[in-house]
Design a protein with these regions (language model features):
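Internal nucleotide-binding/catalytic subdomain
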Residues: 1-87
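A broadly conserved detector of short glycine/acidic/proline-rich loop/turn motifs that flank catalytic sites
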Residues: 13, 81-82, 129-131, 165, ...
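Short, flexible turn/loop "capping" segments at secondary-structure junctions
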Residues: 24-27, 117, 173-178
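Short, well-ordered beta-strand elements within core beta-sheets of diverse protein domains
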Residues: 33-36, 179-187
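Active-site "cap" helix and flanking loop/linker of ATP-utilizing ligase/carboxylase catalytic domains
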Residues: 45-64, 81-155
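Hydrophobic side chains in beta-strands
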Residues: 70, 126-128, 185
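Generic long, charged, amphipathic alpha-helical segments
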Residues: 138-184
């Protein structure tokens, strides 16, 4: 939201919250997401567009997201997020072709512009290790601390590091979260 209007196209994304495939395991903040970019549509007009006058009135500028459940009975908003989140921003970076500095500057400056994006879907997956999604420094130390992060090929396109350190030219897990990186791609 540039302070006056939502910048187009809008981002529509589908989050996967459970730790394991098949919607099983403990809930996490987000394990991965698929997304695409769209022009104004019924989902936008039923949710974000209705908030435009209030956001403008209060002088809000920035990212704004509404989580919803959509089914045969309608669109049901669950929560709003007024900040960039992880790994969503990393996946959006995969799809935005406008340079990020230019995008953020134009947004913060209140400019009327359109985000240049790739066609198709963007996907991101959180690469996790113990103790994620829990906080347990002892488990991290035992199972994950300094673990080597290996790529079959030396291609780091789509790799967004989080808790990683570089030791003698090798990526190793750092921190205590078990959240070393996010991998993104387009198709």
């Amino acid at each position: 939201f540039n302070g006056i209007d939502f910048v187009m196209p809008i981002n529509i994304n589908f989050e996967h919250k459970k730790l394991f495939p098949g919607n099983i395991g403990p809930s996490t903040g987000e394990m991965g997401t698929s997304m695409f970019w769209a022009k104004s549509n019924p989902l936008y007009r039923s949710t974000l567009e209705k908030l435009k006058p209030k956001l403008k009135e209060c002088g809000y500028v920035g990212y704004f997201d509404i989580n919803t459940i959509v089914n045969a009975k309608g669109i049901h908003p669950l929560e709003a997020t007024s900040r960039f989140g992880y790994p969503t921003i990393n996946i959006q970076m995969e799809g935005i072709t406008t340079p990020m500095g230019e995008f953020l500057y134009n947004l913060a400056s209140g400019k009327d512009f359109e985000i240049k994006t790739k066609r198709g879907f963007q996907v991101g997956v959180v690469i996790a290790a113990p103790p994620f999604p829990f906080k347990d420094p002892a488990s991290f130390k035992r199972y994950s601390e300094d673990a080597l992060i290996i790529f079959k090929k030396p291609n780091y396109d789509g790799a967004h590091i989080a808790d990683v350190k570089l030791v003698d030219g090798e990526w190793r897990m750092a921190g205590t979260s078990g959240y070393p990186l996010i991998m993104t791609g387009s198709g």
